[in-house]
Design a protein with these regions (language model features):
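Charged catalytic cores and adjacent phosphate/nucleic-acid-binding surfaces used
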Residues: 1-18, 22, 36-49, 56-77, ...
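Short acidic/polar active-site loop segments enriched in Thr and Asp
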Residues: 25
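Short, conserved beta-strand segments within well-ordered enzyme catalytic domains
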Residues: 28, 53-55
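Conserved beta-strand positions in the central sheet of alpha/beta enzyme cores
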Residues: 28-31, 98-99, 129
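Short beta-strand/loop segments at the ligand-binding rim of alpha/beta enzyme cores
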Residues: 51, 93-98
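Short secondary-structure capping/junction motifs at helix and strand boundaries
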Residues: 78-80, 98
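Acidic/Gly/His-enriched mid-domain segments of enzyme catalytic cores or analogous surface patches
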Residues: 100-104
Length: 228
């Protein structure tokens, strides 16, 4: 899920409190090319004693703008690098690499050729998102079918940019902690699920605000990071 540290509309406190209200045990905060929101959320949980695990991560922009999730990595990763280098770097830092909204044409996403190329090279891509309630997640069923051959851990993610969408998709796993979730990924013991209730409707003004952050603010922040 995303916070105001990239193109989400909820700040870390709002994201944490909404996740708890939704009954989630663990969340992964994955702002675009930034771990600041995730670190802030985890610090808040520790300070306030909230009953929630926070996985620090980011949604990394690789070559050609393709996105990849890096979980359990507490530093910002270089942008626009080849996928193979990014996956190897994530592993070297002790993290796990996951393919979000695979096969989607609505946002730069890992395609079949990229995923199978990484696996052919023996690179440690660990999981693939098979449930994502956003429009970008529509190819999820096809990804689930292809994953019978890939053998990756499946996971569900809300990809929430709006607070009401938190928990719209989730991952079942044995245990209740971030460490349990990681072990389940490694054991291919995760199950992707979508919430029973329909996806919450978002007011047009909020879509406009989020689009502005996504199309103007977030790219400007990325440009500053690249030029530093």
């Amino acid at each position: 899920m995303h916070t105001t540290y990239s193109d989400g509309l909820g700040n870390p406190r709002e994201v944490v409190e909404t996740a708890i209200a939704r009954g989630l045990d663990v969340i992964a905060v994955t702002d675009h090319d930034s771990v600041a929101g995730a670190l802030a959320a985890r610090e808040l949980v520790h300070k306030e004693g909230y009953p929630l695990g926070v996985i620090v991560g980011s949604e990394v922009t690789m070559a050609r703008g393709v996105h990849l999730l890096a979980l359990f990595v507490e530093e910002r990763l270089p942008m626009f690098e080849p996928a193979a280098r990014t996956v190897a770097r994530i592993a070297a830092l002790g993290g796990v690499a996951l393919a979000p909204h695979p096969l989607s044409r609505l946002t730069p996403s890992p395609g079949r050729r990229l995923i199978e190329g990484l696996l052919a090279e023996g690179l440690p891509l660990l999981g693939v998102e098979t449930v994502n309630p956003s429009p970008a997640g529509r190819p999820g069923e096809r990804a689930r079918s292809l994953n019978k051959g890939w053998g990756l851990a499946e996971f569900g993610g809300s990809d929430a940019h709006f607070l009401p969408h938190i928990g719209a998709a989730y991952t079942l796993f044995p245990g209740r902690s971030a460490a349990d979730f990681r072990r389940a990924l490694e054991a291919r013991a995760t199950v992707a699920r979508r919430a029973d209730e329909p996806l919450a409707r978002i007011p047009l003004r909020d879509y406009a605000r989020q689009s502005g952050r996504s199309m103007i603010l977030n790219p400007a922040q990325k440009l500053l990071r690249v030029n530093r």
